[in-house]
């Protein structure tokens, strides 16, 4: 009942005046994440609030990946009394869905160092400094990045060379139709979306031409509101675009040295991220999840470690009562266990990768269809390993 009353206050009086203290929420875990991870935070936040075995409240704010890295490396607190986001439980709001707004709570008056920080690309793209001994890094799902255009645009593809001249030289690049720098919508230099694209088209992040936006929603608004749709182009996380396919299109990208342009998915309308998983689409990064550890390397906050292990696709104790892989797939990310290529730095060369516990068959069944054989205790696999009802490679 207490949280039903607090929820009513939060809904009735927006802003800090009506925000309940975050510390009063059930088992709060504080996160600072990239805005490309908002959809994951909302879905996972709901599931963890209602996770009977271990209820957790994800309390989060969004910021650029480079800012997030510095925040946890330096143990810098989130400002005291800052408004943070969280998701209601089923008991608090049964009608809430991942498309609904988050709720607001107020950070502790003395501030709070994030329990978890997220970078949506290799940390080395932001800093050459190694993590301090008090911070550990875990690789999570893979994040693709796209070049988006308004639905009214007739453009369908772009090459490495064209992107280099468009974003490196703007109007002087003379790449039709992308010559109007006021119609080129990019991000600020701490954001993974810009840094990932910068590494993939060889244009330093601070040299890009275009209108710099702090958040993905601003890029989306600029694209959808453009009065010059043929000239408009912007950079987004693929999972941001996946939720806006009715209003935006993306460009197939031909990377340097390639002979054809590819979408992240096998077609412009599918959601299978096949070309990301097999290396044909090259603009992607791993998500990195950071937590604080003690002098012995043990998590300072075990429940934060629990959350990170979930996101990374690992088994946790106690077991969850929802399907984490299905959640990751639903927001447009790719579980590491479904990837078949890897790289070691942003924009680096790709090499073949075989996950220790493959989940390709299950992932494909979630986002499209799979040709994999099914299995059960009474119907074992003729080859491979039976996992989640499918015969995986290993």
For the regions a language model picked out, list residue spans one by one.
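Flexible loop/hinge segments at secondary-structure junctions
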Residues: 19-394
């Amino acid at each position: 009942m207490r949280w039903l009353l607090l929820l009513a206050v939060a809904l009735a009086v927006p802003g800090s005046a009506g925000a309940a203290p975050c510390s009063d929420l059930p088992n709060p875990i504080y996160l600072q994440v990239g805005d490309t991870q908002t959809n994951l935070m909302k879905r996972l936040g709901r599931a963890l609030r209602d996770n009977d075995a271990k209820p957790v409240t994800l309390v989060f704010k969004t910021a650029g990946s480079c800012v997030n890295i510095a925040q946890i490396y330096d143990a810098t607190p989130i400002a005291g009394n800052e408004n943070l986001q969280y998701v209601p439980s089923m008991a608090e709001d049964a009608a809430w869905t991942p498309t609904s707004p988050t709720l607001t709570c107020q950070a502790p008056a003395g501030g709070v160092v994030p329990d978890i920080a997220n970078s949506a690309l290799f940390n080395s793209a932001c800093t050459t400094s190694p993590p301090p001994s008090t911070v550990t890094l875990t690789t999570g799902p893979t994040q693709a990045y796209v070049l988006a255009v308004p639905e009214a645009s007739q453009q369908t593809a772009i090459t490495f060379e064209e992107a280099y001249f468009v974003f490196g030289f703007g109007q002087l690049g003379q790449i039709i139709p992308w010559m109007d720098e006021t119609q080129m919508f990019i991000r600020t230099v701490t954001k993974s979306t810009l840094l990932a694209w910068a590494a993939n088209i060889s244009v330093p992040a601070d040299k890009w031409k275009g209108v710099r936006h702090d958040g993905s929603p601003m890029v989306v608004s600029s694209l959808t509101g453009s009065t010059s749709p043929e000239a408009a182009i912007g950079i987004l996380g693929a999972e941001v675009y996946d939720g806006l396919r009715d209003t935006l299109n993306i460009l197939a990208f031909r990377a340097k040295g390639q002979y054809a342009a590819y979408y992240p998915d096998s077609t412009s309308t599918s959601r299978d991220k096949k070309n990301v998983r097999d290396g044909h689409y090259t603009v992607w990064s791993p998500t990195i999840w950071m937590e604080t550890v003690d002098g012995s390397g043990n998590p300072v906050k075990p429940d934060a470690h629990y959350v990170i292990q979930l996101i990374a696709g690992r088994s946790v104790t106690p077991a969850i009562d929802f399907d984490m892989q299905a959640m990751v797939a639903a927001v447009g990310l790719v579980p590491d266990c479904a990837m078949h290529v890897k790289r070691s730095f942003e924009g680096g060369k790709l090499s073949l990768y075989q996950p220790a516990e493959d989940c390709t068959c299950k992932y494909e069944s979630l986002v499209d269809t799979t040709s994999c054989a099914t299995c059960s205790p009474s119907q074992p696999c003729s080859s491979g390993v039976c996992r989640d009802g499918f015969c995986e490679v290993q």
